[in-house]
């Protein structure tokens, strides 16, 4: 029997030393599930609400005891006795309990921790790994990693405006080989930075944050590192950017302080298009600000037929926001962050909507992570084809890569590495 007989939450720490919620679920047959909730540094205005205590005398206001209490009282009292295999029903019950459009009452961190722990317990009851339980027989695609190796913007103290510069080993034959390629590029880049007297300390997501003067200088350095590592930029290793443009958008303009320019939305679109023409950039995340819908339309019309344009702050893994974007022709890809929406069921609904509309999907971590590797399983379960989970440093990031390596091994001959086909209709 898969009835829930015990549900318990606790406050633990994430990779940035901030509190987060961890939930344990125990079923009648003894099956057990545990999930820890990630947290973002730069969050979209339309995300579900992460419940924090606000007590400045404890964890500088970032404690999550209110969310923990919500799990241990309100949520537990309601879910005890329910069948863990009825995931959608359980998620719906929690949404009804909360009763707000953005999970502000119980907190998305309380609801998500419970939702994922329930799924893990149900998978354990069936003797299945989470990826197989959620994805079924169609789950066999290993995602191409987007490896964040250079940081700027809000993730770094340097003049670079763009937040993340990533490499994608699209030419590898397997996930394990892709991870090896990424590691070799990462270490080659580290050596190159050191030889130039630049910092090789890593940020929240394991990427370097050197004092490089401009976006193009950063791209040139990465291109050189790819080549020195023995790979062909574009053909074997593609580039990807996360602009996090909302962070430097004000009064209708994009203020690129590092470039010393202020651009209109149309000029920003042209700026990004020029970068794509000069470098093998196949994917751009949040190229426009979350509420600059006209800018998103201009960017999509300009390069959306050849470059993956990923909506993070634009869509926040929310089906209603995504439906709006599909209707208006904004972007062509969905970034999937489970804590932006707050339940497994809603996450799967958003991915399904994106796929049906011909949008690609990218499973993603947050800057505040834990050793929990759930997103690796979900990337395979949903056939996302791409995963964004940091650099080749920090154990909280490597936990996801290592889990993907295990999943690829479990799948055996049925495993399929997405490769360049991860870009869907944009593949070339």
Curated annotation (Swiss-Prot):
Tagged with keyword Metal-binding: yes
Principal location class: cytoplasm
Binding-site residues for (2R)-2-phosphoglycerate, renumbered to this chain: 163, 337, 366-367, 388
GO terms for cellular component: cell surface; extracellular region; phosphopyruvate hydratase complex
First-level EC class: lyase
Cofactor: Mg(2+)
Recorded catalytic activity of this chain's protein: (2R)-2-phosphoglycerate = phosphoenolpyruvate + H2O
Record-linked CDD domains: enolase
Top-level taxonomic group: Bacteria
Binding annotation for Mg(2+): 242, 285, 312
Cofactor: how bound: Binds a second Mg(2+) ion via substrate during catalysis.
GO biological process: glycolytic process
Pfam families hit by this protein: Enolase_C, Enolase_N
Family matches, as NCBIfam families: eno (TIGR01060)
PANTHER family: ENOLASE
Homology family: Belongs to the enolase family.
UniProt-recorded name of the protein: Enolase
Taxonomy of the source species: Bacteria, Pseudomonadati, Pseudomonadota, Alphaproteobacteria, Sphingomonadales
Gene that encodes the chain: eno
């Amino acid at each position: 029997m898969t009835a829930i007989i015990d549900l318990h939450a606790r406050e633990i720490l994430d990779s940035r030393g901030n509190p987060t919620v961890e939930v344990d679920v125990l079923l009648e047959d003894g099956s057990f599930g545990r999930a820890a909730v990630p947290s973002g540094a730069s969050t979209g205005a339309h995300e579900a609400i992460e419940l924090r205590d606000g007590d400045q005398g404890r964890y500088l206001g970032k404690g999550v005891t209110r969310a923990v209490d919500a799990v241990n009282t309100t949520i537990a009292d309601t879910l005890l006795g329910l069948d863990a295999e009825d995931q959608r029903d359980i998620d719906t019950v929690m949404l009804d309990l909360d009763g707000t459009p953005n999970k502000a009452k119980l907190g998305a961190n309380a609801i998500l921790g419970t939702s994922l722990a329930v799924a893990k317990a149900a998978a354990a009851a069936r003797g299945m790994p989470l990826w197989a339980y959620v994805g079924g027989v169609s789950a066999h695609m290993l995602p191409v990693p987007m490896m964040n190796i250079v940081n700027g913007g809000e993730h770094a103290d340097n003049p670079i405006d763009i937040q993340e510069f990533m490499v994608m080993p699209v030419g590898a034959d397997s996930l394990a080989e892709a991870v090896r390629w990424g590691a070799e590029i990462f270490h080659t880049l580290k050596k190159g930075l050191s030889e130039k007297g630049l910092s090789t300390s890593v940020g929240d997501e394991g990427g370097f944050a050197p004092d490089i003067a401009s976006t193009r200088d950063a791209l040139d350095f990465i291109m050189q590192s790819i080549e020195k590592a023995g790979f062909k930029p574009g053909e074997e290793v593609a580039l990807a950017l996360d602009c996090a443009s909302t962070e430097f958008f004000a009064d209708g303009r994009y203020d690129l302080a590092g470039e010393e320019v202020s651009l209109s939305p149309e000029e920003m679109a042209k700026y990004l298009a020029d970068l794509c023409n000069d470098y093998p950039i196949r994917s751009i995340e949040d190229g426009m600000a979350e509420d600059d819908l006209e800018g998103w339309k201009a960017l999509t019309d300009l390069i959306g037929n050849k470059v993956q344009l990923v909506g993070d702050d634009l869509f926040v893994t929310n089906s209603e926001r995504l439906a709006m974007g599909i209707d208006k022709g904004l972007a062509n890809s969905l970034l999937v962050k489970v804590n932006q929406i707050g339940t497994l069921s809603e996450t799967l609904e958003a991915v399904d909507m994106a796929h049906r509309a011909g949008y690609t999907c990218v499973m993603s971590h947050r800057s505040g992570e834990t050793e929990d590797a759930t997103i690796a399983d979900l990337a395979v379960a949903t056939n996302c084809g791409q995963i964004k989970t940091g650099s080749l440093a920090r154990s909280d990031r490597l936990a996801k890569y290592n889990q993907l390596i295990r999943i690829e091994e479990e799948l055996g001959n049925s495993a399929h590495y997405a490769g360049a086909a991860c870009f869907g209709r944009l593949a070339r």
